[in-house]
Regions:
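Glycine-rich phosphate/pyrophosphate-binding beta-alpha loops
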Residues: 52, 56, 111-126, 192-193
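Catalytic core of DAGKc-family lipid kinases
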Residues: 1-108
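Residue-level signal for secondary-structure boundary sites
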Residues: 39, 56, 118, 145-146, ...
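Gly/Ser/Thr-rich active-site loops/lids in small-molecule metabolic enzymes
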Residues: 67-74, 115, 120, 126-149
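A generic structural signal for well-ordered coil/turn residues at beta-strand boundaries
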Residues: 27, 87-89, 106, 112, ...
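Residues in well-ordered beta-strands of folded domains
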Residues: 32-34, 49, 94, 111-113, ...
C-alpha cells in the first residue's frame, strides 16, 4: 500500500517479515481531521498517511460504490469516471491558524501529506517526512483533465512540484472551506470518504 511505500517495507513477504521481526520502532506524526459528515454532524478521523479533498474524494466514493460491480477493476473504472465527472472547485485554505495567510484556489486536488504516496503509488509529496512535525500541503490547481493525464507520470515519479498550477508549502494546521456557498467538496482519508469540507487538518 501507499503507506508501506513511505516506511520502506518491501513487497516481498519474506523480507517484510524479517524487517518486522527485527523489532525496530519509529515514532511518527499522526494527523487529525475535524470535518463535516454528510448528515451535517461533526466528525473526527486520524490518519498516518495522507488526507486530501477534491477529485480524490470523488474517486474514493466512486471506488467504494463500484467494488461490488467491478471487483479488482473498481479503482481504474472509478478513476476514469471521476476524471470526466469532476469539475475543478474553488476552496479557501489558511495555515497555522492565521486567516490572514489564507488563499483562494481553484483546485483539482489538495493533499495534506504526512506520508509521500497516495492514489495507488502516486508520489504526490516527495519531500514529506513522517516525523518532522509538519504536513506537506500539495495543491494541484486549475488543471484540465488533459493536463492531469499528460503530467500524471511526473506525479507518480515525484518530479511535479515545479510544474505550473502545482503549489507546495508546509504547515502544522490547515483549514479548508468551500469558497462558494453550497459547494460540496469531498474528503479522501486513506481510501475512504468520511465527509466534506469545511475541515481542519492538525498534526
Amino acid at each position: 500500500g501507499d503507506f508501506v511505500r513511505t516506511v520502506g517495507i518491501p513487497k516481498d513477504f519474506a523480507k517484510a517479515v524479517k524487517i518486522l521481526a527485527a523489532g525496530h520502532r519509529r515514532r511518527i506524526d499522526v494527523g487529525r481531521i475535524d470535518y463535516v459528515s454528510r448528515d451535517g454532524s461533526p466528525g473526527v478521523r486520524m490518519f498516518a498517511n495522507i488526507g486530501s479533498f477534491g477529485m480524490s474524494g470523488l474517486t474514493d466514493r466512486l471506488v467504494n460504490q463500484s467494488k461490488k460491480r467491478f471487483g479488482s477493476l473498481s479503482f481504474f473504472a472509478a478513476t476514469a469516471k471521476a476524471m470526466w465527472q469532476y469539475d475543478n472547485q474553488r476552496v479557501r485554505l489558511s495555515f497555522d491558524d492565521a486567516p490572514a495567510d489564507g488563499v483562494d484556489l481553484t483546485i483539482n486536488t489538495v493533499a495534506i501529506a504526512n506520508g509521500r504516496y497516495f492514489g495507488g503509488g502516486m508520489m504526490v509529496a516527495p519531500d514529506a517526512s513522517l516525523d518532522d512535525g509538519e504536513f506537506d500541503v500539495i495543491a494541484i490547481g486549475d488543471m484540465s483533465m488533459t493536463d492531469f493525464v499528460l503530467k500524471s507520470r511526473r506525479m507518480y515519479a515525484g518530479t511535479h512540484l515545479s510544474l505550473e498550477k502545482i503549489s507546495h508549502r508546509r504547515a502544522r494546521v490547515v483549514r479548508a472551506t468551500p469558497a462558494e456557498p453550497g459547494q460540496v467538496v469531498e474528503l479522501d482519508v486513506d481510501g475512504e470518504t468520511p465527509g466534506i469540507l469545511p475541515a481542519t487538518f492538525t498534526v
